Structures are given as structure tokens and as C-alpha cells.
From Swiss-Prot:
GO BP term, pick one: translation
Keyword Ribonucleoprotein in annotation: yes
Annotated GO CC locations: ribonucleoprotein complex; ribosome
Listed name of the protein: Small ribosomal subunit protein uS10
Protein family according to the UniProt entry: Belongs to the universal ribosomal protein uS10 family.
SMART domains: Ribosomal_S10
Entry keyword annotation includes tRNA processing: no
Keywords (A to Z) from UniProt: Ribonucleoprotein, Ribosomal protein
Alphabetized GO MF terms: structural constituent of ribosome; tRNA binding
Species: Caldicellulosiruptor saccharolyticus (strain ATCC 43494 / DSM 8903 / Tp8T 6331)
Pfam families: Ribosomal_S10 (PF00338)
Function: Involved in the binding of tRNA to the ribosomes.
Length: 106
């Protein structure tokens, strides 16, 4: 990897505990290869509320609400090496965590 690159990792999950464990694992892996790590930075939580009517016909005043929260974290790896990229490709993450990796020229 070139020294003028930065790796930006975005993590998303419905469970914040899984998200924090995954972020910790990624940071430890990157630091063990000698890369500089910035983060994890907590990003704003997305909250989606869904309202449905409880009864199938009338009684519109009787409603139920469900919500789902999406927690997000951001990790920047400054000056990643090829060893860092290889180590991050081998990291095992839980099934409930979505990861997005972008390489960015600085």
C-alpha cells in the first residue's frame, strides 16, 4: 500500500455490543500490524419507527409501534500496509455486523 492512502471502515449493527466487540477486534488487528488507528468513532444511531393498527378492521385509535435502531462506528486506519490489509481480510466478524471498507487517497 502507498503511504498516501487511508482505509476507512464503517460498521453497522442492530446490536451495539456485537458492534463494539467487532470494532475492538479490528483495532487490535490493525495495531498488531503496525498501522496507525483512529477510532472507533460512534456515529449517530438511526432510529426507524413503524406504526401499525392492532385491529384488522376498525379501532384506528388502537395502534402499536415498533422501532429498530441501527448503531454505527467509524474506524480510520492511517498508512495501511499490505500486511494490514491481509490481516483484516482474515478477521472473523459476527453475522449481525455489516462492514464497509473504502481505500481513500489522502
Amino acid at each position: 500500500m502507498s503511504k498516501a492512502q487511508r482505509m476507512r471502515i464503517k460498521l453497522k449493527s442492530f446490536d451495539y455490543k456485537l458492534l463494539d466487540q467487532s470494532a475492538r477486534k479490528i483495532v487490535e488487528t490493525a495495531k498488531s500490524t503496525g498501522a496507525e488507528v483512529s477510532g472507533p468513532v460512534p456515529l449517530p444511531t438511526d432510529r426507524e419507527v413503524i406504526t401499525i393498527i392492532r385491529a384488522p378492521h376498525k379501532y384506528k385509535d388502537s395502534r402499536e409501534q415498533f422501532e429498530i435502531k441501527t448503531h454505527k462506528r467509524l474506524i480510520d486506519i492511517i498508512k495501511p500496509t499490505q500486511k494490514t490489509v491481509d490481516a483484516l481480510m482474515r478477521v472473523e466478524l459476527p453475522a449481525g455486523v455489516d462492514i464497509e471498507i473504502k481505500l481513500k487517497e489522502v
